[in-house]
Every structure is written in structure tokens, then in C-alpha cells.
């Protein structure tokens, strides 16, 4: 599936600026424009001989800032003016005949056409991006002016299933939750820029109190956790490394219970991959609740404010190894769960062998980025909604059938009464 979409903005100007958005713009003296509401994501000034384009770094309105290096103007890919990371906007200033802009002469206008391209690329050695590719056509007309509105397409995610591998008493689970963490998410649909709320749990039965840890998490386009491409979310025995880059992913502190661990992940899709499914596989493990967390059993998040790691519980120094990428013995990353004995030394026929570690997969998470994917959305309707639609359809068919029978019987009765009237 093509993971890109086109956001169309027509800019029809006469020596002034006017964005084609539902919000009206007031034209001021000097050929400038002023929105009546919030700052527009793209503002264009068609001047006498130059074209000035100002792009908000919050281009999609999701508070996920784009990078200036991912923006170009025109077929020749003109780069923006130099700006600092602290600025909220990216600016282009080019001549009307530069950057491969096209010119067309009509009966009543001189039309210059070009486009703004946002083409996100993975940061560093990562293989994921968190925003979509967008091509925004720009058009300047002289001397006419007008306004054409366009609404952005909102990419979405679609449903998921959960697969659990466990034995006997210990049951591991990984669920997608609502934002308030109170209930499981009923409609697993996301937009780029949203945050997925994941909750890992261990159901202990009659066992002694246990503490749950997420040792490793990896995202792949198939259920196979060893598939490629892949993106590591948690690594090094509990370091949430996804929060190191442009994401706000983090563990939630404090825990609701020792046997439950919650964390958030900024949603994403794989760059240059036609598959629109993402599976998240986490390796879960437990320790005794009374055991203090250490480098091998921890839950650490990265704080961009302090530029440091911090744990959900336990001393702060247990997270220092996250920066080094070495937290002791090799991680359980991308392998099957290990089975150990939690027996008490009783005779062999009474001993229990259960898993204190397990791989749990949540998926598929289906990412939609085109309005044409509504068929996928319909596939994700809840069971009760499908039954309601089926019942409504059957009721309509029954009503139409009953109406047809009544009409046929009425016509026959009228036909049978005609000879009697003639004899009289």
C-alpha cells in the first residue's frame, strides 16, 4: 500500500496572500494576510517577482514537528532558507521562474504553478517515520484572486488481535487500552501523531506476589518477530529506547500494581514498505515482588528535558546502562520464551513447570493513509455493529415481502368481484 497522500491547497492571489482553508483570511495593506484564528500550516505570498512560502513545523496539526531537511519546493527540489531548531516555521523565498515552476497563460490570468513536498526520511539508522509524505500544490494567478478549500486526509490505524504463549498458572497478556487506562480500547483506530497505550499484565493465580517487566519489544510488519524491517521499542532488559528519538514513548509511573506495567508508544509506520500491518512482540518476564529492581529487571524511560534515563521504581543508577547499550547478559530479544521450574522440591509428580517468561504479540495494527481504505475500516467493525446491520437488513427485506403479498392479495380480491357486479 502506498504510504503517502496528497494534501491539495489552491492559492489564487492578486498581489496578496490568501490560503485555501475553511478559516477566512483578512487581507491587510501591503499585500499580507492575517488569519482570524490560529496560525495556518502553510502561508504563501505571491509577490511581484518572488514566491514566499512559510511552513509551520506542526504541518499536520499533531504537535509532531517536521524537520526542515524533509521539505523542498518545486520539481528541482529547492531547499528552504537556513533556520534554527528553535524556530517554529520553515521559509522558502524563490523567484517565480525558479525551482522548475511552470507558467501558463490563459485568457484572463497568468498562472504560476509549483508544489511543496514533505518527504520524511528515517532519523539516523532507524527504519521508521512518524509522519506521512505530502505533496501540496501551489498556484499563483495574476490578476485574479479566489478561494478554494481543501480538507486534509487523516491517516488511521485499524484493529488488532492478541496472541499469548504461556503454560499453567502464569498467564501473560498485552492489551491496547483507552487513554485513561481504565478499559481496553474498543475501537483500535489511530491517526499518525496519536499515542498507543499498551498494558502488560501477569495473572498469577495462587502464586506468591510477582513483579512484571517488559524485557524487550520489537515491531515488525508480520507476526514473525525476526522479520525485516523491524523497529526496536524496548531493549537492554527494560530500556524504552523508542523514546530516544523524536517520540515521547515512556513507561507510566507509578505502576497501578506490581503485576502490571503500562507504557505509551507514538504510532508509526515503516518507510518504503508497501505492507500496512504492524505487529508488536514483547518479551515479558517476572520476579518476586519483594525483589529490588536491578539492571536485568527494570523499566526505564528517557527524559528529553533532563537528557537522562529514570526508572519506574528502584535506584536511578540501574538505568545508567541504557546509555551504554550494555545491561549485563545478552537480551532475550527476538527469541522464544524460556521455560523454568518454579517447583518447591516436592516429588516429581507434584512439581509444576511453568513459564516465568513469555513472548506476547499484539497485532495486526493496520495503518490506513488513504480514504480509499474504507473497506478495511468496515472489516474492523465490532461484532455487535455487524449483527445490528444484518438484523436491519433482514427486517427491511421482510417488510418489503409483506408489502408485496398484501398488494397481490388486494388485486386478486378486486378481480374476483368484477363478475358479481356484472350479473347484477
Swiss-Prot record:
Gene3D superfamilies referenced in this protein's UniProt entry, alphabetically: Zona pellucida, ZP-C domain, Zona pellucida, ZP-N domain
Topology class, membrane: Single-pass type I membrane protein
Disulfide bridges in this chain: 46-140, 78-99, 217-282, 239-300
UniProt-annotated location(s): Cell membrane
Membrane-spanning residues: 388-408
Residues of the propeptide: 351-424
GO molecular function: acrosin binding; carbohydrate binding; receptor ligand activity; structural constituent of egg coat
Segments on the Extracellular side according to the record's topology features: 23-387
Main location: membrane
Reported modifications of this chain: Proteolytically cleaved before the transmembrane segment to yield the secreted ectodomain incorporated in the zona pellucida. N-glycosylated.
Span of domain ZP: 45-307
Tissue-by-tissue expression: Expressed in oocytes.
Topological domain ranges for the Cytoplasmic compartment: 409-424
Signal peptide start-end: 1-22
GO BP, sorted A to Z: binding of sperm to zona pellucida; blastocyst formation; egg coat formation; humoral immune response mediated by circulating immunoglobulin; negative regulation of binding of sperm to zona pellucida; negative regulation of DNA-templated transcription; oocyte development; positive regulation of acrosomal vesicle exocytosis
Gene Ontology CC annotations of this record: collagen-containing extracellular matrix; egg coat; extracellular space; plasma membrane
Keyword set, alphabetical order: Cell membrane, Cleavage on pair of basic residues, Disulfide bond, Extracellular matrix, Fertilization, Glycoprotein, Membrane, Pyrrolidone carboxylic acid, Receptor, Secreted, Signal, Transmembrane, Transmembrane helix
Pyrrolidone carboxylic acid found at: 23
Annotated function: Component of the zona pellucida, an extracellular matrix surrounding oocytes which mediates sperm binding, induction of the acrosome reaction and prevents post-fertilization polyspermy. The zona pellucida is composed of 3 to 4 glycoproteins, ZP1, ZP2, ZP3, and ZP4. ZP3 is essential for sperm binding and zona matrix formation.
Subunit structure: Polymers of ZP2 and ZP3 organized into long filaments cross-linked by ZP1 homodimers. Interacts with ZP1 and ZP2.
Description of its domains: The ZP domain is involved in the polymerization of the ZP proteins to form the zona pellucida.
Family: Belongs to the ZP domain family. ZPC subfamily.
Protein name, per record: Zona pellucida sperm-binding protein 3
Organism expressing this protein natively: Callithrix sp.
Gene designation per UniProt: ZP3
